[in-house]
A protein has these predicted regions:
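Transmembrane alpha-helix signature in integral membrane proteins
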Residues: 1-16
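Membrane-embedded alpha-helices of multi-pass transport/permease systems
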Residues: 9-13, 27, 56-85, 115-123, ...
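Cytoplasmic-entry segments and transmembrane alpha-helices of multi-pass inner-membrane transporters
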Residues: 13-45, 71-75
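Generic hydrophobic transmembrane alpha-helix motif, especially the helices
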Residues: 32-64
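Transmembrane alpha-helices
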Residues: 63, 96-128
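Short cytoplasmic-facing helical segments at TM-TM junctions of multi-pass membrane proteins
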Residues: 72-111
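Hydrophobic alpha-helical transmembrane segments of polytopic membrane proteins
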Residues: 137-174
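Transmembrane alpha-helical segments of polytopic membrane transport and secretion proteins
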Residues: 170-199
Length: 199
């Protein structure tokens, strides 16, 4: 849920600071500062205000997910070719239409890249969340640290967490590549080059 809330808040913020670029530096700096706080310290700070349990973990995941989502949304929107946007304006498109029909589709792969990073980070934070009473796979790791010969427990908790992170990373990386607008252009230019070589 933390990553979902971060998408709901972070993507509009990323779009907003891409339109008003003077605000990009303070917004990204604040998100960067949050990111520099160690996850276990952030959980401890929030635990004092919110108590033990999953809510504290969700809020922590939300805070750590903001930076990659805001930054990638901002970067994706800013890097859209101005000539394409000018062509849209020339066709009589409004600012909202350019955003919906040009900027967001062309920056979607970059935004998904931010979500991918946020999800991988979130998995690590959720595992640590067991230390403050949130029921996760990290429970098994904690049991292992408390037992005299806990290597089996630690591996039983750590391996599934690592596998989930790897699967999500590979899946979203594949989706990123599929949605990359430059992918088709690269493919076409390679085919063109091969045809020229044959001639």
């Amino acid at each position: 849920y933390g990553v979902l809330f971060a998408c709901i808040i972070g993507i509009p913020i990323g779009i907003f600071i891409a339109k008003y670029r003077r605000l990009s530096w303070p917004v990204i700096t604040i998100a960067n500062i949050i990111q520099t706080v160690p996850a276990i310290a952030m959980l401890a700070i929030l635990m004092l205000a919110m108590g033990l349990g999953p809510t504290t973990v969700v809020v922590t995941v939300f805070l750590y997910s903001l930076l990659p989502i805001i930054k990638n949304t901002y970067t994706g929107i800013v890097e859209v070719d101005e000539n394409i946007k000018d062509a849209g304006k020339g066709m009589g498109m409004t600012g909202n239409q350019i955003l919906r029909m040009i900027e967001l589709p062309l920056s979607l792969s970059v935004i998904i890249g931010g979500v991918r990073i946020a999800l991988v980070v979130a998995i690590g934070i959720v595992a640590i969340g067991s230390f403050i009473g949130a029921p996760t796979l990290g429970d098994i790791i904690i049991r292992g640290t408390n037992s005299t010969d806990g290597t089996t427990f630690i591996l039983a908790g750590a391996i599934p967490i690592a596998l989930i992170a790897i699967i999500i990373d590979i899946g979203l990386r594949y989706l990123e590549k599929r949605l990359d607008p430059t992918r088709k252009n690269k493919k076409d230019s390679m085919q063109e080059h091969q045809v020229q070589k044959l001639h």
